[in-house]
Amino acid sequence: MPREIEWSDAEEIGIQLQEKFPDLDPLSVRFTDLHKFVTELPDFVGDPMKSTEGLLEAIQMAWYEEYKDAQ
């Protein structure tokens, strides 16, 4: 059974976003879109209202690391 993820699970979210959007450069994604992408992940159980700029930055950087590794 997949593990439920929250806003603080940046690394796992980054992995899942890379799997879902392998050709999308994370640095080109606006935070409003990133927020939507995260809240639509099937394992995400966090409160959509609890995101912060810092959490979104951490997720974006974790996703970017996965993106770079896949290139």
Report residues per predicted region:
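A charge-rich, low-complexity, intrinsically flexible signal that marks solvent-exposed coils, linkers
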Residues: 2-71
